[in-house]
Amino acid sequence: GGVFDREDVMHQMSLGADGVQVATRFVTTEECDASPTFKQTYIDSSKDDIEIIASPVGMPGRAIGGEFIRRVKEGLMRPKKCPFHCIKTCDYTKSPYCIIMALYNAAKGNLSRGYAFCGANAYMSKKITSVRETIESLKSEFAAACRRNGQTAVL
């Protein structure tokens, strides 16, 4: 995780990786099916906005803090019923919120009733681009960094 730009790629390669996986950077592409509001949350975020939260099943997740997460912390989002039974280990009577509703609302852009999961570097997203532009940018950044280090880029 945490691979966003050429420095991150170079760091992973210096550790012996043959390749990297990039995810967060593609959320703010035109082709991503997340709502414009969801994408804008990434663009508007700062490093300090990103936090680790607990899911109703006890697993940690990284998310961009906002109204919904604040209300969860205040105990205001506890579900009164469970219409979905989507996760066997989820006990809605003890859950701080309904994860399926939070994720659905976030995907639709209703971030007062959901939140944006993200990678550690989501705050580095600055604009909406195309997948093509993002890939070309990564390739050119990486190739330039390899040349500076006297290495051959294999793309």
Question: In which residue ranges do the predicted regions lie?
Answer:
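Conserved active-site-proximal phosphate/metal-binding subdomains
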Residues: 4-155
